[in-house]
A protein has these predicted regions:
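Short acidic-glycine-tyrosine-enriched beta hairpin
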Residues: 137-153
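Conserved short histidine dyad/triad with adjacent acidic residue
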Residues: 10, 42-44, 86-90, 100-119, ...
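Glycine- and acidic-residue-biased ligand/ion/polar-headgroup-sensing regions
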Residues: 119-137
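N-terminal leader/capping segments at the start of a protein or of a new domain
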Residues: 1-76
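Signature of the catalytic double-stranded beta-helix
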Residues: 63-108
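A short hydrophobic beta-strand segment most commonly corresponding to one strand
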Residues: 100, 122-123, 148-157, 163-180
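Double-stranded beta-helix
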Residues: 8, 14-15, 161-204
Length: 204
């Protein structure tokens, strides 16, 4: 059975995350230009309601923030409005075209990897537990808490090898230019996530 077939089967086995909800704190400025706390609160799981009837979420998938241009425009809270528009549109894929996406993802114990590719440069940080990074060639790479992965538009997947403990990772995805290797264009390939997530729309 392939990694993607195992992932599809695992959808039936897991409910929500066992890790505590995280709080997002956003800063800003008051009328005098002094730093203040703009807002705080929990971030909802963006997987809710996206699976077919009878299926359950295989992981928690929270979009903490997005930007939609380089460099980001913070004047008059333009970035906050842009983020809200992205979330409310319901069209966000894994990558936000011309911008960034910051996610917190919780992987249940013993969940196979969903192998996929995005047209993006990604930073992955292990916050809790451990995770195996699955690539097309070579042995899985085991990342421990505090380790980081720089994912450069490759086919890859993440597998929590623990039988009992959840894994939490932070991901920052940045749109990148179209990638070619030896004349072959490598485009987004969502694999088993294609039935759950929308296309990013940045590799046309």
């Amino acid at each position: 059975m392939s990694h993607n077939e195992e992932f599809a089967a695992a959808v039936e086995k897991h409910q929500g995350t066992a890790l505590r909800p995280f709080t997002r704190y956003i800063t800003g400025h008051n009328a005098e230009g002094k730093a203040v706390l703009h807002s705080s609160g929990e971030v909802p799981n963006s997987f809710k309601g996206q699976f077919a009837p009878g299926e359950t979420r295989p992981m928690a998938f929270n979009v903490a923030y997005t930007t939609s241009e380089f460099p980001a425009n913070l004047n008059n809270d333009a970035d906050l409005a842009a983020h809200e528009n992205v979330i409310q549109s319901g069209n966000l894929g894994l990558v936000n075209p011309n911008g960034t996406v910051f996610r917190i993802v919780d992987f249940p114990p013993d969940t196979p990897a969903a192998v996929h590719r995005t047209q993006s440069l990604d930073y992955g940080i292990v916050l809790e537990g451990q995770v195996e990074m699955i690539l097309e060639e070579g042995e899985p790479v085991l990342l421990q808490r505090g380790d980081v992965a720089i994912q450069r538009a490759t086919m890859h997947g993440w597998r929590n090898p623990s039988k009992t403990e959840w894994t939490r990772m932070a991901f920052i995805l940045q749109d990148c230019k179209p990638l070619e290797v030896d004349g072959t264009r490598l485009k987004e390939d969502l694999g088993p996530l294609g039935g759950v997530l929308k296309s990013s729309g940045n590799d046309q």
